[in-house]
Amino acid sequence: MALAIALLAFSGAAPALANGKDISFEADTVSVNDEDGSMLAVGNVQMKQAGMTLTADEVRYKRVDDRAVANGNVVFVDADGAIHKSDMMVLDTEFTHIVAETLRSRYPDGSFFIADSGDIKTDSISVFDGSRFSPCDCEFENGETPIWDLRATSTRHNVETSTIIHRNVRMHILNLPILYLPYLAHP
């Protein structure tokens, strides 16, 4: 079912959900609660806006909060092609601010982040806590171990300057810690 049909039934929330930008939306079922201004999309949910795509098993939008909560097999692809996966994500209605727990991100250059939590801002600085980073273009999610990776308590990725800054970082080679640095920055 297309979002246009669901949003016609959801009338007052349509401008808030799309914020004046075109958004396409598909799901197996969509239900609207007129009392609290919420919408629930369940089953094969797919949302597209400004070159970004979100897929999930379920998305709940609350007009009062002006945010969406996606649950189950959540995959967000940003306009640059970075792929972010999690079991749950909270997004603003323009897809520019995403918060997730247990986040796995793969960037177009093949590098990846895995983090206990991530606060992604698609147009500025993203923060990954309990992070693991490697430029290795390997199938990490399928059990392949990178030759080396960096593990940090906190990592900041600045999209504008293409800079990555790690705090309390340990370099691991073949899963063995070999070097500790309180601070490390790289492109």
Residue ranges, per PLM feature:
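Bacterial N-terminal signal peptides
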Residues: 1-12
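Structural signature for solvent-exposed beta-strand/loop edge elements and short helix-capping sites
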Residues: 17-187
